[in-house]
Amino acid sequence: MKKISILALYLLLILFSGCMRSVQLNERAIVQAVGLDWKDSEYALTMQIFDPEAAQGDDTSGGKMLRVTGKTISQAMRNANLKQGQEIFWGHTKLIIIGEQIAKDGIESVMAYFNADAQSRPNIDVLIADGEAGEVLSEPLDSTILPVLSTKMMLEGYQDNGKLVRSQLRGILGSLENPAVGAYLPMAAFS
């Protein structure tokens, strides 16, 4: 009986072990928002990365912008890891902005990439940029809070007032899988 209990305990301990390596918070680049564009036959990613030191001070940007390119989204992400020197973390991403050119060519591959990533959450808001997503994401906002949070609050306000219907990753994926339903996304433009 004692041997069975010890064996059961060992099996239980094996179940609690994870298959992913441990990454400390200071080794991660926490992406708050990402803009994807298609330029010169490659993807151009603009990422707003959270910077805790900037968030503690008077800097209302709360982060830094990282711009990378690649033939595929995966290659651009690998380039972002190399350029940033930290592991890119999607778990707290609140906003994806897709450039107008990618939207015209089809968003299926972009949505499939974020759906396949284990860190991406299904409730990420998705917008189409009127022009380039990197420009929309880089636009400074007159705000005392983080720009991505300000944009998210604007989306919620417009939805509450019936001015737009928010599109999130899970809803878009469902619409793309169903041939009887069309996906709809709000367009972001600054004037």
Residue ranges and their predicted role:
Residues 2-191:
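Membrane-proximal alpha-helical signals and transmembrane carboxylates
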